[in-house]
Amino acid sequence: MSERGNRKTQVGVVVSDKMDKTAVVKVDRLVKHPVYNKYIKRSAKYKAHDMDNAAKIGDRVLIVETRPLSKDKRWKIRQIIESKG
């Protein structure tokens, strides 16, 4: 058996937990402007699989890339880094 390749991981904040077994995670990143050389904050929202419905709004979580689980879900919550509540 061969090992799986390196999977992408990202750290973000849960912005919605209303769906069953799914959380929406907002991931921020800094991008350097090509002309002004100033860093701009860009964000992306990912739907992540949350098997136990453990993540709550405001929690800081680590998400890892996985196989497609539905039309929009390609990430899983690996761990809750910091709990808001």
Swiss-Prot record:
Return the PANTHER family for the record.
40S RIBOSOMAL PROTEIN S11 FAMILY MEMBER, SMALL RIBOSOMAL SUBUNIT PROTEIN US17M
Q: What is this protein called?
A: Small ribosomal subunit protein uS17
Query: Per its UniProt record, what PROSITE patterns does this chain match?
Result: RIBOSOMAL_S17
What lineage does the source organism belong to? Bacteria, Pseudomonadati, Thermodesulfobacteriota, Desulfuromonadia, Geobacterales
User: Which CDD domains does the entry link to?
Assistant: Ribosomal_uS17
- Family recorded in the similarity comment: Belongs to the universal ribosomal protein uS17 family.
- NCBIfam families per the UniProt record, alphabetical: PRK05610.1, uS17_bact
> Pfam families annotated for this entry?
Ribosomal_S17 (PF00366)
Q: Which organism is it from?
A: Citrifermentans bemidjiense (strain ATCC BAA-1014 / DSM 16622 / JCM 12645 / Bem)
The record describes the protein's role as: One of the primary rRNA binding proteins, it binds specifically to the 5'-end of 16S ribosomal RNA.
Give a GO cellular-component term.
Answer: cytosolic small ribosomal subunit
BP-aspect Gene Ontology terms? translation
Domain of life the protein comes from = Bacteria
Task: Extract the SUPFAM superfamilies matched here.
Answer: Nucleic acid-binding proteins
- Gene behind this chain? rpsQ
User: Assembly and partners?
Assistant: Part of the 30S ribosomal subunit.
Tell me which InterPro entries the record gives.
Answer: NA-bd_OB-fold, Ribosomal_uS17, Ribosomal_uS17_bact/chlr, Ribosomal_uS17_CS
Care to name a GO molecular-function term for this sequence?
Answer: structural constituent of ribosome
